[in-house]
Amino acid sequence: MTAGAEPPDPDTLDVEAVLLASEQRPISPEAIAIATRLAERSGAPVHVLTNARIWGTSFGFPNPGLYPSKGEWDKQRAIVDETVRALERAGVEADGHVIGARNATKRIVREARRLRCDAIVMTADESRNRFVGNFMWSQEPQRVRRRADVPVYLVTAP
């Protein structure tokens, strides 16, 4: 599959694992439903991943004041726990974890490779102009789609 291309119909894709990812936003029930469809068809597990954003560097060096706060970590853990429970209620094997990264796109794609996922599902905002979108954190799912070498299903946030 070509990076950035529209993914195939979820009912035609055989997968060994699915990554249900978020750059920091809550994972929508619609995204959970698509991940469930993909996983049930092949009996695959779903790995849930969220990112607690690291806000940058100070003079080129990591700065503890720019790391996620305890509250931010807890919020992301709650999103993962809620999503894993929803997947397990649907009868899908699921696990999850939270990462901390400045560049969520690179980490999500790297985790998908490491976990040998054949598809990524993310909740996303409407796509913006690519030039403007590159400056917006909310366009991270679109950047994941452009960079990933597996199908990326973007579910528009309600």
Summary of predicted features, one role per range:
Residues P7-G65, R147:
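Small/aliphatic-rich secondary-structure junction motif
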Residues Q142-P158:
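Short, flexible loop segments at boundaries between secondary-structure elements
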